[in-house]
């Protein structure tokens, strides 16, 4: 259930965000680097108080998003000043705020929607699953110019039947350490729920879904499967990699620009808080 803003307390907002990751060094704040989390600065300007966004997924350098979700806690008094009620009946509640942000933000990042978050909502820990898409072109000319920032050119034909068979060996709750860059204190156990391939002419698309992803996991999975697709490796090789306890150098990580974060799934509103507790416990138990 979503509560109306109360100026006497902080209000949690849900933000739906899209960005072209080409010129960003990922989501997370990094000293001296331009990152998507720099959205904090725009919100701080609008609300005249320091704020910090929490995202559903921290995308890597060069990775795009059409369906990133974040939350931010804003003092009710600051929110009421930054978002005066629209005089037009039927307009979205936060339309004035959305328009102010659109004027402040660079053209390669947009806040698509703003809403009061339901009670118990946490953009990261309430999430059930994240969906990514990876796109490649096997066209002899490479990639169409208007898609060059979002599609990876692949110089060889790919055997999608072999890639699909190898992908099935990776599904389920597993330790994906071999496909993840090390991050101190972070678990590499994830549930990979979908990894499917489709083809439309020269365009090949991977559809990837998991409860969560660790650092560089998606691009590493794609890189390993491409080695199967052009017959440098056997179908069973990817499954065999899972027996390794640390990241492998046996495959090349796929280029970042072909990857897009497209959607986050959440449970019904009355299950959000419980889901956040379960996720926190799960992440700390491994």
Swiss-Prot record:
Where on this chain does substrate bind? 132
Which EC class is this protein assigned? isomerase
* CDD domains per record: PseudoU_synth_EcTruA
**Active site: which residues?**
60
GO terms in the biological process aspect are: tRNA pseudouridine synthesis
Q: Which InterPro entries match?
A: PsdUridine_synth_cat_dom_sf, PsdUridine_synth_TruA, PsdUridine_synth_TruA_a/b_dom, PsdUridine_synth_TruA_C, TruA/RsuA/RluB/E/F_N
Annotated PANTHER family: PSEUDOURIDYLATE SYNTHASE, TRNA PSEUDOURIDINE SYNTHASE-LIKE 1
Q: What exactly does this protein do?
A: Formation of pseudouridine at positions 38, 39 and 40 in the anticodon stem and loop of transfer RNAs.
Q: Which family does it belong to?
A: Belongs to the tRNA pseudouridine synthase TruA family.
Q: Under what name is this protein listed?
A: tRNA pseudouridine synthase A
**Gene of this entry:** truA
